[in-house]
Amino acid sequence: VPHTRSSLLWGVAAAGLYGLSAAPGVVWADSAKLTLYALHAYLPSLNPGDHAGWVLLAQGWLGLTWFWSPTYSLHLLSAVAGAVVVAGVHRLLLRWGDPLESAHGAAAVLLVAHPLWWAAAVAESYTPALALVVVGALLLSRGTTPAVGMSGVCAGLAVAAHAFAAVLVLPLAPTGRPRTWLPFAAGLVVGSAPMWLAWIANPPDPLTGFSAGGGGSWSWVVRAFLSPDRWVRGVALVAGAMGFALGPIAIIAIVRRIRRGGFSRHPNPILAAVSLSALAALLTVYSPYRLHLMVSFVVVGAVLLAPPAASLRWCIAHGVLQVALYGAAAGGAHLVGRESLGVRQLPGRDNATYFLLPPKSWEHSAEAYARRLLAAVPENAVVLADFNPGAVLRLVQELEGVRPDVTIIPTAVDDALATPDPSGVLAGRIGEARAGGRPVVLADSWPPYYRVEELRRLGYSFAPCGPGLLVERAPDR
């Protein structure tokens, strides 16, 4: 009972921290996309980027929290799931027979780990997927047939929520007699239904309007996000992200744990180590834009495998140092003029604060951008956007019921960039809309995407339109 109480206390602490860190409204990119998917009940889908298992969870959660706005409610889903991860890992290590100090150390590391805290503050698939893995492992440790079957359901739903959850599920899966693994396998099939049912029905993506949830979507993901040429830079980025997530105190403690006592009492530590190494290697060639969140699977897996033994003083020191580290990193980036962090700065977004500080309670840039643009565009306009602002614009338009006269094409720029002649394709889109008598607005002016200078050379001219650009004149054709 005292051990159960201590696990609950860690969960309450995590729920408080993550709940206070939750974003109040719409957030850029995948968060906006996933919220739109939840509102449209977009499933089933085999596309790993559609996170169909998360959509199913979100549907149930929205039904329970009908009194909150959908955006805030789904941010809180991540916060609650993050708290389940922290408390669940603490309880799981005790269930495996590890010392109480190791469980405390693991919970302390996870509580303030950058990727987990960050993902727990916004509507994302990471913490729900991790929570399902941990809950499934706790059920599996009970050993009864119903519990093993439900463990399989949790594992299947975790993989359907985020494909990388398979890295943690595989080493935890039962082996041996069919009596042990058959209920788990049956549950796995049931839990992963939000994915495999797409072989029977494949609804259109509510963001793009295309049916992109079939089996061919996996090959698209490989082409779009994996590049072996990135591996040298990728090794440095993965090592840096892991170091930033764990911090110096935790890294020293984990290394000391491995040297002195080896691994935890994980049911399959060798396979777990191999799986985590494989994921880390994959992340070195993966698109770096989501790396700060993707490493959450490696962090949780590492802590389950080698939890550091910790006193209360150690836990407090680690937490204080990590918070100071995140603040110093964001402040330092501003001091040296590198607040962009070398990536695209979306309108109103400060990259150093946005990416390096996990709390999102002050994040309003996405909503402010969408409202400014939708207020400025002419009547009956067509807005050509790329995914980042496009998902936000579409979500705000739908949630607030504003500007139904405006047509937002949220991935028009992405589609153009996938062709040999992006500026020519964009020019064709502009010409098509203007031929129908409709004004055209570019959602942003970032040169690598919107090719404004190339379009000017083709005879187009532009005028400011809120945070976007209005196509003022087009060449005679």
Cite the ranges covered by each PLM segment.
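Loop-to-helix entry region of an early transmembrane alpha helix in multi-pass inner-membrane enzymes
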Residues: 52, 56, 66-87, 104, ...
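Membrane-lumen/periplasm interface segments of specific transmembrane helices
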Residues: 181-223
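Short acidic/glycine- and proline-prone juxtamembrane loop motifs at membrane-interface regions
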Residues: 29, 118-126
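Extracytoplasmic catalytic/substrate-binding loops of multi-pass membrane glycan-assembly enzymes
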Residues: 20-35, 45-60, 72, 362-365
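Hydrophobic, aromatic-rich transmembrane alpha-helices
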Residues: 236-265
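Hydrophobic/aromatic-rich transmembrane helices and adjacent perimembrane loops
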Residues: 286-310
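Signature aromatic-anchored transmembrane alpha helix within multi-pass, membrane-resident enzymes
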Residues: 185-189, 307-341
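Membrane-interface alpha helices of multi-pass inner-membrane proteins
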Residues: 15, 106-108, 134, 147-162, ...
